[in-house]
């Protein structure tokens, strides 16, 4: 059988695609696993030893409150040289240190809550939490200030183990009530009684701690304080006796707070913090009087707090307390970190269960074998080690309370183990991890417990951020069921005149998404991240006029044809028996045309062909198209309730990409995961990697790297990202639909600054609108995407000419409106605004800073006079400024290119001069220290990004191009601010309808050719006139026939078309003899012909294989209304264009003059200060006996000197501010890398949970990898709240960024009522 195929020629060659396996290479998986194990071990050690250290320090301070002149301990007898000299100030220092340890976290919470309440964030007071936390504060303070001073260290430790008293009592009562319940058999009751007996015994044992020492004949006087302290602390430790059984009971609020089902609201936080501070201070005051400190008064407390001297014990005590506070914050952070990694300390080594035993063992050992080094260290703080308060007997004879104390210790450790023991959950369960919302400094182990809880289906509907429970019948209540988990993602790409390589790149990414989407939707595993996918490509200016056989047609241009051929090649679609492709449908639309494609795995891809004669072109208007089409027409116009449409908007996301973007499905999944974690995120963006070839791309690789490593990470950590790149960002639909965002994005430029802010950087403007409305923009470093960067010098400069003014304009706009931005957006604080102000301020001073650096480096390298070098450098830069004001861009770019090459050699001199300065002045000199620190930080950042480490190599190119980019590029961008053309891909001027400016020689040649052509026309005009008339008549007849044939194919009325054509010919003949045309009939005729021509493009050679479709009437109406409202092609008159040009020139002059003046003044000031360095400098010696090398002007030799360095105060100030910015960004980078590392650990864990090996076996594991490898992003450990912040599912109805559909509906109803009222009055 032969069907036309040669089976013998079935062998093939094709490009090998990247392996669809895990994104983490095997060596990275191994390193991450080893790092994870090491971190787990280190964190457990820090938690355990830190808890022991904290507990011992607190107890040592507490046992030293009351002087012990009557007691001579073992340490005192052995270590006579470590005598302790106590003063009243030292005693006041002990009191203040314990107060600081306990109340400092509460003070921080009080301040933060006050600020939040000032912003209007309140809530209903949870009284039970206030009462119990007050009891805990009273209990801990009573024990620390009244009871512990009368005990020794060992007895203090065993008494601390009795805090689970109420928890044991509760278990006893539950068991006894269960045994006494009616309806049970005798055997069942007897069995339950036996179960209750151990709990009753433990309760009685722990209860004995309230009175046992009062039975002995000793000097213990805190008989009343002891039971009060133990019972209050035990009752206040409510996390130990509240569990899941209290859900729905009178303790339901406590249950929700413990398991982070609900956050502790601002009002409750403030009152709890205030009451804890008041209770602690009150108990401290009472202790000062009851403990009979005869010489202690308020002046001693004031002196202890304000008199700072590291030689005094009270200052050392306060510093020690500060160290303990820092340790507590670190341990709380470590506990949260382990919870985020889903790594919990082993139950038997948790601080709550093991710290008392370790501390007790160490105290017993130290008391049996006293070490004088401990005594000497404690003596420096005015403290001593208290071993045995009473019953000082011979060696080997135990005290009467020894055994009962040991039982307390064992019972307390057992109850601690029961509280922190690990629970095992099914992989399909949704787990919440939480920590106690209050930090207890005097008993830190209680604040290090991580609780886990599995949400059942009923509880999921009650998850809120605040305390108000949604009404079950509320129309706007959003349910969290399985349907909510399936998100809808619209992938929207904007194209113009991309190359074949760029188109192939974005198509390959879309096809990978198609496969991943189908795999996930078909896989029904619980808790798997699934999404619906639909692709949209908006082809800007995709049409051109083509004249064929004398007939002018409007057809898709060569770029779309190239895209269509490429799409067929990559999808492998074949023709059916009728010679058609069933998966390709062509549709006429009011904006041009549309190609609908069904991808191999079922995803629909809509290719929108925009005609600039029918709709506005450029990227911003394409974005307006898909926003209004997908969010307005698809969501707002659908016949659903407000609740359902709100749910659609919350679960709908737009993936904005460029026509050359390249990314993996995992990158999208990471962004989706981030968006699902927090509801206030309006947009999430990934790490953009520039690709391409050439020196300019190398420069951009390093530039992008440090921008993401430092600036973007710092923005993410300390505030929020200011710009979401349009090449790869995920937007939440409900955020875009909110007020002052999508609608305001349609605003056309009416002022000169609007052209810069709106049209030159549309991505930055959209980001600014989101930030002002209160939405966060977050950055996910692990979500990688690639895009082609400009490879040529001119294209790079033109790109930055657009970006720089737009970035500055939008940042200034945000800073000028900082009050509203800070009020609406919780992520934007005044400190963050100040940081952004510093960044933009120093970026504007970049030319002056780099210019002066070049000058002084050349002075040092070539040993020239500073004034001469400043003149030599000032002339070329000044000449470039003149060129920017007076000449065309191409001349400016040619000059900038050659000067960039020249200054690259100058930078080598800078490198030599800087190296010599470091050698001569040593690394400790301020300038040398700054340079070495900056280089070290860059290298450290590269080490923290191992996958991107090679970018550090491109830092050499970045260094050589510093003058080019920080001087010439900055000046070029600002002075050409009035040029609003894009400047990239300008080779295709044919499509834009504009002619590019030609060189003078080209213009001369064109004039000569025109003259020759006109001469030939004059010679042959008479001979060809009659021939031309006959030919025109023939062409008109052929045109009529061709129109008729094509009209038959399209189903149009042939007679009507022919009549219209004849009428048009008659009108043309009449217009040749008449003095005026009949315009209305001509326009009508043209419309008829245009209507017939609408189907001509579908019959082109490449597109005739596609099926034909028809737009639905509702969608056609929508597009017509949208175009009329926002997207009509903008027609400007010459007068309007002149006014715009003049306005832009005026704006350019103002801004350029200001920046040039400031930079000139700064450069001159630095130069003059350096010239008069001997008078206007600051003398600085980094260390004592500092020596450096200096040239002797008399001998010309280098000699060592001990003279102080002479520092320029202005330059030093700039260096200090730059260092501050760099350190802030480095801190932000470290915190962001920690967050990214948590995600990487989670991926490694999920790799093995879903059965994916990090080593790819392409022979046996292809199918398994296809089904499982993409599941590794679905980690619940990070998305659920693993700290005191609680579990966030959605925001409350009162939120400004919540229920967008409800707000829009209210506005619509208000307009309707207003119109009806007006009509009534009329």
Curated annotation (Swiss-Prot):
One of its GO terms (molecular function) is chitin synthase activity. Keywords: Cell membrane, Coiled coil, Glycoprotein, Glycosyltransferase, Membrane, Transferase, Transmembrane, Transmembrane helix. Residues 61-128, 178-193, 243-269, 338-342, 418-836, 887-892, 944-951, 1170-1209 are cytoplasmic. Glycans are attached at residue 297. Disruption phenotype: RNAi-mediated knockdown causes the production of abnormal eggs characterized by a spherical morphology, the absence of the eggshell chitin layer, increased permeability to small molecules and a failure to divide. Loss of polar body formation and loss of egg-3 and mbk-2 cortical localization in oocytes. RNAi-mediated knockdown causes polyspermy in 40 percent of animals and a failure to internalize egg-1 after oocyte fertilization. Simultaneous RNAi-mediated knockdown with mat-1 prevents the formation of the eggshell chitin layer. Belongs to the chitin synthase family. Class IV subfamily. It catalyses: [(1->4)-N-acetyl-beta-D-glucosaminyl](n) + UDP-N-acetyl-alpha-D-glucosamine = [(1->4)-N-acetyl-beta-D-glucosaminyl](n+1) + UDP + H(+). Essential for the embryonic synthesis of chitin, a component of the eggshell. GO terms for biological process: chitin biosynthetic process; eggshell formation; positive regulation of protein localization to cell cortex. The keyword Transmembrane applies. GO terms for cellular component: cell cortex; plasma membrane. It comes from the Eukaryota. It is a multi-pass membrane protein. SUPFAM superfamilies: Nucleotide-diphospho-sugar transferases. Its EC number is 2.4.1.16. It comes from Caenorhabditis elegans. Pfam families: Chitin_synth_2 (PF03142), ChitinSynthase_IV_N (PF23000). The chain crosses the membrane at residues 40-60, 129-149, 157-177, 194-214, 222-242, 270-290, 317-337, 343-363, 397-417, 837-857, 866-886, 893-913, 923-943, 952-972, 1149-1169, 1210-1230. Residues 1-39, 150-156, 215-221, 291-316, 364-396, 858-865, 914-922, 973-1148, 1231-1322 are extracellular. InterPro entries: Chitin_synth (IPR004835), Chs-1/2_IV_N (IPR055120), Nucleotide-diphossugar_trans (IPR029044). It is found in: Cell membrane. This is Chitin synthase chs-1. Residues 455-486, 1019-1053 form a coiled coil.
């Amino acid at each position: 059988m032969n069907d036309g195929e040669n089976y013998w020629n079935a062998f093939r060659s094709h490009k090998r695609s990247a392996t669809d396996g895990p994104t983490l290479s095997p060596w990275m998986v191994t390193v991450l696993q080893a790092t994870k194990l090491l971190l787990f071990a280190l964190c457990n050690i820090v938690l355990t030893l830190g808890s022991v250290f904290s507990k011992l320090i607190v107890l040592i301070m507490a046992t030293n409150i009351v002087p012990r002149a009557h007691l001579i301990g073992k340490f005192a007898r052995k270590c006579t040289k470590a005598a302790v000299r106590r003063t009243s100030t030292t005693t006041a220092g002990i009191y203040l240190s314990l107060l600081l340890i306990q109340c400092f976290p509460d003070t921080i919470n009080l301040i933060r809550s006050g600020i939040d309440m000032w912003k209007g964030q309140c809530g209903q007071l949870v009284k039970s939490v206030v009462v119990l936390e007050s009891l805990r504060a009273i209990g801990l303070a009573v024990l620390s200030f009244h009871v512990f001073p009368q005990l020794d260290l060992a007895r203090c430790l065993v008494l601390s183990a009795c805090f689970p008293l109420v928890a044991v009592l509760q278990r006893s009562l539950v068991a006894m009530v269960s045994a006494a319940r009616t309806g049970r058999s005798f055997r069942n009751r007897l069995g339950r009684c036996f179960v209750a007996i151990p709990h009753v015994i433990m309760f009685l044992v722990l209860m004995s701690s309230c009175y046992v020492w009062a039975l002995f004949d000793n000097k213990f006087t805190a008989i009343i304080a002891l039971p009060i302290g133990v019972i209050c602390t035990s009752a206040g430790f409510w996390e130990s006796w509240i569990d899941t059984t209290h859900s729905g009971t009178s303790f339901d609020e406590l249950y929700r707070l413990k398991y982070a089902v609900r956050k502790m609201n601002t009002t409750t936080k403030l009152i709890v913090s205030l009451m804890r501070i008041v209770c602690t201070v009150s108990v401290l005051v009472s202790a000062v009087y009851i403990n009979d400190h005869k010489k202690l008064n308020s002046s001693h407390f004031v002196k202890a707090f304000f008199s700072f001297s590291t030689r005094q014990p009270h200052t050392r005590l306060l510093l020690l307390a500060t160290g303990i506070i820092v340790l507590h914050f670190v341990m709380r952070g470590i506990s949260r970190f382990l919870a985020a990694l889903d790594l919990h300390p082993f139950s038997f080594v948790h601080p709550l269960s093991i710290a008392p035993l370790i501390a007790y063992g160490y105290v017993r050992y130290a008391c049996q074998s006293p070490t004088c080094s401990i005594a000497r260290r404690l003596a420096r703080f005015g403290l001593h080690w208290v071993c045995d308060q009473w019953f000082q007997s011979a060696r080997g004879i135990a005290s009467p309370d020894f055994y009962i104390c040991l039982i307390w210790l064992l019972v307390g450790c057992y109850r601690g183990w029961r509280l922190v023991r690990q629970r095992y959950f099914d992989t399909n369960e949704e787990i919440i991890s939480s920590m106690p919302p209050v930090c207890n400094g005097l008993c830190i182990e209680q604040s290090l417990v991580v609780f886990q809880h599995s949400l059942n289906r009923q509880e999921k509907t009650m998850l809120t951020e605040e305390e108000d429970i949604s009404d079950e019948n509320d129309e706007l209540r959003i349910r969290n069921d399985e349907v909510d988990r399936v998100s809808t993602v619209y992938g929207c790409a904007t194209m113009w005149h991309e190359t074949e390589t760029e188109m192939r790149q974005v198509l390959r990414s879309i096809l990978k998404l198609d496969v991943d989407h189908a795999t996930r939707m078909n896989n029904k595993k619980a808790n798997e991240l699934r999404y619906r996918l639909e692709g949209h490509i908006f082809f800007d200016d995709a049409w051109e006029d083509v004249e064929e056989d004398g007939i002018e047609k409007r057809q898709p241009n060569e770029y779309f044809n190239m895209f269509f051929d490429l799409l067929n090649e990559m999808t492998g679609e074949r023709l059916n028996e009728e010679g058609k492709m069933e998966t390709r449908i062509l549709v006429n639309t009011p904006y041009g045309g549309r190609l609908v494609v069904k991808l191999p795995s079922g995803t629909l891809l809509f290719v929108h062909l925009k005609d600039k004669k029918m709709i506005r072109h450029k990227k911003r208007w394409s974005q307006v198209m898909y926003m209004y089409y997908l969010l307005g027409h698809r969501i707002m116009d659908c016949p659903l309730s407000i609740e359902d449409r709100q749910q659609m908007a919350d679960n709908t996301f737009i993936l904005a990409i460029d026509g050359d973007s390249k990314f993996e499905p995992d990158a999208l999944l990471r962004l989706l995961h981030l968006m699902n974690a927090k509801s206030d995120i309006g947009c999430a963006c990934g790490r953009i990697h520039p690709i391409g070839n050439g020196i300019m791309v190398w420069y951009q690789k390093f530039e992008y790297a440090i921008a993401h490593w430092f600036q973007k990470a710092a923005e993410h950590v300390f505030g929020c990202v200011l710009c979401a790149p349009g090449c790869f960002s995920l937007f939440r639909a409900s955020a875009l639909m909110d007020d002052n965002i999508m609608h305001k994005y349609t605003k056309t430029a009416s002022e000169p600054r609007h052209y810069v802010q709106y049209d030159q950087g549309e991505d930055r403007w959209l980001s600014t609108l989101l930030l002002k409305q209160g939405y966060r923009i977050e950055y996910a470093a692990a979500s990688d995407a690639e895009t082609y960067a400009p490879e040529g010098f001119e294209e790079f400069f033109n790109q930055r000419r657009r970006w720089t003014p737009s970035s500055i304009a939008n940042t200034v706009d945000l800073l000028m409106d900082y009050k509203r931005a800070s009020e609406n957006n919780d992520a934007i604080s005044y400190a963050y605004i100040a940081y952004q102000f510093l960044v933009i301020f120093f970026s504007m001073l970049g030319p002056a800073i780099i210019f002066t650096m070049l000058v002084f480096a050349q002075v040092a390298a070539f040993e020239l006079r500073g004034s001469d070098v400043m003149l030599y450098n000032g002339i070329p830069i000044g000449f470039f400024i003149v060129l920017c004001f007076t000449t065309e861009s191409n001349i400016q770019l040619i000059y900038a290119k050659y000067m960039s090459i020249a200054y690259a050699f100058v930078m080598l001199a800078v490198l030599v001069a800087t190296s010599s300065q470091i050698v001569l002045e040593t690394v400790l000199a301020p300038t040398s220290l700054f340079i070495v620190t900056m280089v070290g930080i860059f290298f450290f950042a590269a080490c923290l990004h191992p996958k991107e480490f090679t970018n550090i190599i491109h830092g050499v190119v970045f260094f050589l191009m510093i003058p080019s980019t920080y001087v010439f590029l900055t000046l070029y961008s600002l002075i050409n601010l009035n040029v609003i053309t894009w400047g990239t891909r300008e080779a295709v001027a044919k499509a834009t309808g504009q002619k590019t400016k030609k060189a003078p020689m080209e213009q001369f040649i064109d004039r000569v050719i025109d003259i020759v052509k006109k001469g030939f026309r004059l010679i042959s005009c008479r001979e060809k006139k009659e021939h031309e008339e006959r030919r025109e008549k023939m062409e008109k007849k052929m045109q009529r026939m061709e129109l008729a044939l094509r009209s038959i194919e399209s189903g149009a009325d042939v007679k009507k078309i022919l009549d219209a054509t004849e009428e048009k010919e008659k009108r043309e003949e009449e217009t040749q003899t008449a003095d005026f045309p009949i315009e209305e009939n001509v326009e009508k005729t043209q419309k008829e012909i245009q209507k017939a021509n609408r189907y001509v493009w579908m019959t082109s050679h490449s597109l005739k294989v596609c099926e034909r479709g028809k737009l639905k009437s509702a969608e056609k109406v929508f597009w017509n209304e949208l175009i009329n409202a926002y997207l009509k092609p903008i027609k400007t008159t010459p007068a309007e264009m002149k006014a715009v040009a003049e306005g832009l020139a005026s704006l350019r002059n103002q801004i350029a003059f200001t920046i040039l003046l400031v930079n000139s003044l700064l450069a001159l000031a630095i130069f003059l200060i350096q010239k008069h360095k001997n008078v206007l400098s600051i003398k600085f010696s980094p260390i004592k006996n500092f020596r450096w090398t200096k040239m002797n002007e008399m001998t010309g030799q280098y000699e060592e000197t001990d003279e102080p360095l002479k520092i320029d105060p202005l330059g030093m100030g700039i260096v200090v501010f730059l260092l501050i910015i760099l350190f802030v960004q480095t801190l932000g980078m470290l915190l962001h890398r920690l967050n990214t590392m948590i995600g990487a650990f989670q991926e490694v864990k999920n790799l093995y949970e879903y059965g994916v090996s990090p080593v790819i076996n392409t022979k046996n594991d292809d199918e398994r990898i296809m089904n499982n490898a993409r599941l590794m992003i679905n980690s619940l450990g990070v998305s659920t709240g693993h700290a005191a912040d609680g579990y966030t599912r959605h925001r409350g109805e009162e939120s400004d960024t919540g229920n967008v559909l409800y707000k829009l509906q209210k506005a619509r109803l208000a307009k309707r009522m207003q119109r009806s009222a007006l009509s009534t009055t009329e």
